[in-house]
């Protein structure tokens, strides 16, 4: 209340699922500071998650590929924006440097900050440690701003063209459509592919479902193997392998159009929850209480 907040930065460049879970912060900022200009520092690969968001005025791309010159340009951009309020929701060394570079009069982080990132902040939000579920941790921003009574909404924008594509895909497949994502960033988070195949075959055989397999380009080999295993179990069934063939907007569209999603603890799990599709999440080394949508 003691400063005139006109420019706000959210620094959360990486971690697919966590970016999705932190999107409701934008609605809180819009409620508390309706006239402020809001920017988000985001990695190239995840920029689609925030592009065209109604609560965002600008996304600033963070790229690891550009070397020191790119890094210097990013820090200069952050400094020149003259932000009044900054939230570091990543809490790593690199985001601590970004946060400090803004020279904003108010810089706030989370108790999960490590690698010295907390030193760049004027304060860390209480009850935002690792013992708190991730989605609750990010919503502490809203509570700090006095608007925690709001219903958290991701506010993801799915273009009409992507929705139309997904609708056509679902109609062509026919019946109930179940999306499956067998991948995850950590190997220890990945449920055995054979188990996914058993579930997929059961959905086809017992419920007449069609399957859509999703994932990144790196996961296409795994989804191809999954399709092969499923079709060993059932003589008939529609299984479409879309892994590596969709951007994040199309992924959101197909997950939104599906009747259900079966997935490991991963970014697509949180994206499916954000667009309102029922999710069956498989947690191996993590827990639903801390990491669930």
What would you call each of these model-derived segments?
Residues 1-293:
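Catalytic machinery of carbohydrate-active enzymes
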């Amino acid at each position: 209340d003691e400063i005139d907040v006109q420019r706000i930065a959210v620094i959360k460049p990486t971690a697919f699922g966590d970016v999705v879970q932190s999107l409701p912060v934008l609605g809180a900022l819009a409620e508390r500071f309706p006239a402020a200009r809001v920017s988000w520092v985001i990695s190239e690969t995840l920029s689609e998650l925030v592009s065209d968001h109604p609560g965002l005025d600008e996304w600033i791309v963070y790229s690891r590929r550009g070397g020191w010159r790119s890094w210097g340009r990013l820090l200069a951009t952050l400094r020149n924006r003259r932000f009044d309020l900054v939230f570091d929701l990543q809490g790593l060394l690199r985001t601590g440097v970004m946060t400090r570079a803004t020279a904003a009069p108010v810089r706030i982080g989370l108790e999960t900050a490590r690698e010295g990132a907390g030193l760049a902040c004027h304060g860390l939000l209480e009850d935002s440690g690792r013992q708190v579920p991730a989605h609750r941790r990010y919503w502490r921003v809203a509570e700090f701003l006095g608007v925690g009574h709001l219903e958290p909404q991701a506010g993801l924008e799915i273009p009409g063209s992507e929705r139309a594509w997904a609708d056509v895909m679902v109609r062509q497949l026919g019946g109930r459509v179940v999306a499956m994502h067998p991948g995850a960033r950590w190997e220890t988070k990945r449920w055995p592919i054979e188990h996914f195949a058993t579930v997929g075959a059961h959905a086809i055989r017992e419920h007449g479902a069609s399957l859509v397999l999703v994932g990144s380009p790196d996961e296409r080999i795994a989804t191809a193997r999954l399709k092969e295993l499923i079709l060993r179990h059932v003589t008939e069934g529609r299984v479409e392998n879309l892994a590596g063939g969709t951007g994040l907007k199309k992924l959101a569209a197909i997950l939104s159009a599906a009747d259900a999603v079966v997935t490991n603890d991963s970014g697509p799990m949180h994206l499916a929850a954000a667009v309102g599709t029922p999710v069956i999440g498989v947690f191996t080394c993590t827990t639903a209480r801390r990491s669930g949508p």
